[in-house]
């Protein structure tokens, strides 16, 4: 599941909030306002692009709904583009990820994103769209979260209370906004409106993580407009809350290679990394622990860590999988200070992006899947953090549950390429395996040792596979697509302390 993201507002965005309200009054639903600019590619050649605002109803179910802006950009394909090639609509993840700064920002991430967009020129037109409610050309809906206490361990009870409080705070903070208009159906409607405004009959979809869920919503609610799709780190409409045993299996796959890394051998207990995980679970299930550490300003801070904090920690440091074994082994050998510092940072008040829980509460979960979640054999290890707060607070958020008719998969003949890593702990690989039977024209590429990443990053060592994906987007041809890709074993990080003389658990020491 995606995290309830912390807000980040790029500097160039702030000026956009000064745009006069009359700019919206001059437009009607479905209008676009476009500016034309140019960037230079890696060869120094000028590439023209359009950047603009799509004006859409905040809630299409209400005739008097106010208009909101959604940012988008388009890079047109070369004149040599094959006639009839559908444009690729690139859907960002998150939710709560602004991306249009890639045209002007100079940081490495923005430059890499722009390079990836320009590469789509070999397919045809590329259209990038941001997300309603968190877009550089419209509203950025956030609230300030409340801090969590240091003097008791993290708990599901506190998490539920925090989620419910956030829902009430969101409604109070935006009395002039219709927050019920931020359901997954409205996100899908924005794609259809932009397609129509730009004059396309059919489109292709490209997205990962929430972008994949967004794409699946478009295919479910507007199937006639989609020619084909490429989705990665897949999050099905009924899988917003991850099955704990599927997530745990991803950890087991990382541990398999870590157990065979010579550099980690001196730190491993008998039974390997998963034995360390089990020992940590037993340790923190027995009693919480108070850890004292120094903050950046030198001040001492004490924080209580318990079983719930450990359950959440087991999934930290997994995006960069090479870091995870060293993190777990540090905890196993009772080096808690760095972890305590991370938890303390997470407990501080920070801005929260609202479109995540608004979209999640609109999708919810089927009764059958909720039963599986609550009876999953890995709950003891990972807890109910991934879903309890969302389910308990769903009625507090203004978006309406769209029901099983939308979230449960149906058979579709849209050709889709799924790309999924088996080390993904945010959207486990089983998500793709469960969806594949509903896509008779689907093709899955399973990436061994792939994490929660975008399609082309997962295929970074496979140029032929990348070209085959571009070819699929251009023509629909699947013959060159592999079934499986294997990434090399990563160079696992080593704990920052010297190996113990024995890999047995050291005696408890005062913190």
Task: Annotate the PLM regions.
Residues 1-3, 21, 360:
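The N-terminal extracellular segments of secreted preproproteins, especially immediately downstream
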Residues 2-13:
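Bacterial N-terminal signal peptides that target proteins for export
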Residues 12-21:
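Bacterial N-terminal signal peptides
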Residues 26-304, 358-511:
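Gly/Pro-rich cap/lid or specificity-loop segments adjacent to the active site
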Residues 234, 323-343, 371-380, 486:
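Short alpha-helical "patches" and their helix-cap loops
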Residues 334-367:
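Long, low-complexity segments enriched in small/aliphatic residues
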């Amino acid at each position: 599941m995606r995290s309830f993201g912390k807000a980040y507002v790029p500097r160039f965005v702030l000026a956009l909030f000064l745009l006069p309200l009359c700019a919206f009054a001059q437009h009607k639903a479905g209008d676009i306002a476009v500016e034309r600019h140019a960037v230079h590619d890696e060869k120094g050649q000028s590439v023209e692009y359009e950047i603009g605002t799509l004006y859409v109803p905040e809630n299409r179910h209400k005739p008097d709904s106010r208009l909101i802006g959604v940012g988008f950009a388009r890079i047109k394909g070369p004149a040599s583009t094959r006639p009839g090639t559908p444009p690729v609509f690139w859907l960002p993840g998150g939710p709560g990820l602004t991306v249009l700064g890639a045209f002007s920002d100079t940081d490495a991430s923005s430059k890499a994103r722009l390079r990836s967009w320009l590469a789509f020129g070999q397919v045809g037109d590329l259209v990038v769209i941001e997300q309603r409610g968190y877009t550089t050309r419209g509203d950025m809906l956030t609230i300030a979260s409340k801090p969590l206490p240091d003097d008791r361990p993290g708990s599901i009870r506190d998490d539920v209370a925090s989620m419910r409080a956030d829902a009430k705070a969101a409604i109070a903070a935006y009395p002039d906004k219709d927050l019920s208009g931020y359901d997954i159906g409205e996100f899908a409607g924005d794609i259809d409106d932009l397609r129509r405004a730009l004059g396309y009959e059919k489109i292709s979809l490209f997205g990962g993580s929430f972008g994949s869920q967004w794409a699946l919503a478009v295919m479910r609610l507007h199937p006639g407009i989609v020619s084909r799709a490429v989705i990665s780190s897949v999050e099905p409409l009924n899988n917003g809350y991850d099955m704990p045993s599927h997530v745990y299996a991803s950890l087991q796959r990382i541990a398999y290679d870590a157990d065979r890394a010579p550099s980690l051998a001196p730190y491993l207990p008998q039974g390997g990394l998963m034995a360390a995980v089990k020992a940590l679970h037993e340790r923190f299930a027995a009693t919480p622990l108070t850890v004292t550490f120094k903050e950046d300003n030198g001040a001492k801070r004490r924080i209580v860590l318990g079983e719930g904090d450990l359950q959440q920690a087991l999934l930290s440091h997994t995006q960069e999988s090479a870091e995870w074994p060293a993190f777990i082994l540090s905890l196993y050998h009772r080096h808690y200070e760095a972890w305590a510092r991370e938890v303390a940072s997470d407990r501080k008040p920070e801005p929260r992006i609202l479109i995540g829980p608004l979209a999640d509460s609109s999708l919810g979960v089927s009764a059958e899947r909720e039963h599986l979640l609550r009876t999953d054999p890995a709950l003891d290890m990972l807890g109910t953090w991934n879903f309890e707060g969302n389910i308990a607070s769903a009625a507090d958020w203004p978006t309406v549950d769209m029901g099983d008719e939308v979230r449960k998969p149906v058979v579709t003949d849209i050709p889709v390429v799924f790309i999924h890593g088996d080390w993904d702990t945010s959207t486990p690989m089983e998500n793709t395996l469960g969806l594949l039977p509903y896509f008779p024209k689907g093709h899955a590429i399973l990436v061994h040792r792939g994490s929660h990443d975008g399609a082309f990053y997962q295929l970074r060592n496979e140029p032929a596979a990348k070209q085959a994906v571009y070819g699929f987007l251009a023509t629909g041809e699947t013959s060159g697509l592999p079934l499986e890709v294997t990434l090399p074993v990563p160079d696992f990080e080593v704990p920052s302390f010297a190996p113990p003389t024995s890999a047995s658990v050291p005696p408890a020491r005062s913190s």
